[in-house]
Amino acid sequence: MPIQNSPYKAFATLLNSGGHKVSPAELHGLLLGRSCAGAGFDNEGWFADASMLLETEPQDNIRAALVGLQEMVKGELTGDDMTVVLLLPGDDEPLTERAAALGQWCQGFLAGFGLAIGDKVLGSEAKAVLEDLAAIAQVQDALEESEDGETDYMEVMEYMRVAPLLLFTEFNEPAEPQPKPSLH
C-alpha cells in the first residue's frame, strides 16, 4: 500500500497552499547546495535564499517547515553517519515525475551552491561533481518508463546520495570534536 502523504507530497501541498509554484525537490536542492558550499546553517541566510526561489517572503507555517528542513539537512551533513536523503517523490510515482523532480533538485542544488561558493577555488573533483549535476539536470526528460529506465534512475540516485557529501567535505570546516564528559 503506497504512502498516502509522503514527505515530498506533504511539502508540495504546503508550498501550494502558500501560492508557491516551486517544487520541494528544487527547494531542498537549493538548501543542500548552499550548505555544501559552506553557507552554514543560520536561518536568516537560508530564508533569504529560499525567499528568492519562492519569489515572496514565506508565511509562518512555511518558515517553520524551512527551519525543519534545514535542521534535517544539518543533521544529515554533520551527523556521525553523514547520510543524505533527497526530498523527491516516492518510488510509487511515475518515473517521469521522479526524473523531473530529480532534475529540479539538481537545478536547485547548483543555484544554492553558486549563491554560497563565492570566490572559493574549486578542485577537479568538485568541478566534476558539479558538471555531473548539470548533466543530470538536463536529462530529466530522457528516462522512459521501463526496466532500463528504472535501473538508470536508481544508479543516478546512488550517485546523488554521495555527491553532496563530497562537496560538503571539501568546502566546510570539520566540526570541532566535543570533549566527552569524564566519569569521576
From Swiss-Prot:
<comment type="similarity">
    <text>Belongs to the UPF0149 family.</text>
</comment>
<dbReference type="InterPro" id="IPR036255">
    <property type="entry name" value="YgfB-like_sf"/>
</dbReference>
<dbReference type="Pfam" id="PF03695">
    <property type="entry name" value="UPF0149"/>
</dbReference>
<dbReference type="InterPro" id="IPR011978">
    <property type="entry name" value="YgfB-like"/>
</dbReference>
<protein>
    <recommendedName>
        <fullName>UPF0149 protein PSPTO_5224</fullName>
    </recommendedName>
</protein>
<dbReference type="GO" id="GO:0005829">
    <property type="term" value="C:cytosol"/>
</dbReference>
